[in-house]
Amino acid sequence: MIEVLLVTICLAVFPYQGSSIILESGNVNDYEVVYPRKVSALPKGAVQPKYEDTMQYELKENGEPVVLHLEKNKGLFSEDYSETHYSPDGREITTYPSVEDHCYYHGRIHNDADSTASISACDGLKGYFKLQGQTYLIEPLKLPDSEAHAVFKYENIEKEDEAPKMCGVTQNWESDESIKKASQLYLTPEQQRFPQRYVKLAIVVDYRMYIKYNRDSNKITVRVHEMVNHVNEMYKPLNVAITLSLLRIWSTRDLITVQSDSKVTLGSFGDWRKTVLLKQQSHDCAHLLTDITFTKNVIGVAYKKGMCDPKLSVGLVQDYSSNVFVVAAIMTHELGHNLGMEHDEDENGKKCKCDTCIMSPAISDPPAQLFSDCSKNDYHTFLTNSKPQCILNAPLRTDTVSTPVSGNEPL
């Protein structure tokens, strides 16, 4: 039986509540302050695990109590998850950290069936939740001897006036290489009855991004974990589990030429993945996180229908926003292309017109969290026609994929 931890968050007036403040997510011009206070349901004197499997948080929104129910995302890491960086002389240094007792959660708001939440509890509470159609973010205020957190709407993050950020995939663009279909094996009745798919994702961080975060590998690692936790949450409605298989940080130099032409860089990364990375550790798809500025306002690109192909199961994502939620939305979009999804609206304005869906060609504001019906149909067509075999394999841990939590479930 899983013990439940109840935490009451008390709202309080902060001296500069409502004024602008600089947070990790950016400059925020309107926010509320909350003070988390734990009220444990465990018996007095019982030993509490560092991070409980199930937690509840209660806060007040417009004077009404809101109950946030969270469950640990046990599917976040693969059993063989590894982290690699490089010594000054270029030697690979690989570790296999213990990640079973991690601090990343998904959840729902009680009595709000359309709600979602993706939260890190590693150092305070950080992440987002969707309540009554509105996206809120929460993160700790870095104050000495204080448990204060800021809660704010995404729309209250100050943004620069700039051209729309675009995906580099166009309607007619395809790789010069055909995608091999040799892995179209027979599906067992069990696989047909249980259509869950599992993507073991490899994340590679380029040298520019390493410099951007002041050569702090730990900070980058936490950011990537938060990012993939968000991506995993957004793929749940499609019954796709995104599992982080490996994290590699190019901490001395880039191992390919990362240039502003996104499609050239994507091709180079695909070659490197096929000839180097795939031979070192098993995974299904690899994405390169970079701090380079691509031409034509491109912030991401991936091969359409490339999933499971040795060279084409790759994508590029620019770490262009300090808000990890925004970058996670870009990664979710590019993974959609890997899984056979087209843009919701093509160059002729046809197909699904959905400016607030994940596969819109331009990133929406706030970033979309839902796939359109067209995207779901594209994905199902890809599964039927291409039969990507690699994503049929469930992770080895028996507790990897947890049951989604309904917003209407009794707590």
From Swiss-Prot:
InterPro entries named among the record's database cross-references: MetalloPept_cat_dom_sf, Peptidase_M12B, Peptidase_M12B_N, Reprolysin_adamalysin
Protein's GO biological process: proteolysis
Record GO terms (molecular function): metal ion binding; metalloendopeptidase activity; toxin activity
Annotated cofactor note: Binds 1 zinc ion per subunit.
Enzyme category, top tier: hydrolase
Keywords: Disulfide bond, Hemostasis impairing toxin, Hydrolase, Metal-binding, Metalloprotease, Protease, Secreted, Signal, Toxin, Zinc, Zymogen
Binding, Zn(2+): H333, H337, H343
Localization of this protein: Secreted
Protein name: Zinc metalloproteinase/disintegrin
Active site: E334
Function: Snake venom metalloproteinase that impairs hemostasis in the envenomed animal.
Signal peptide: 1-20
Domain of life: Eukaryota
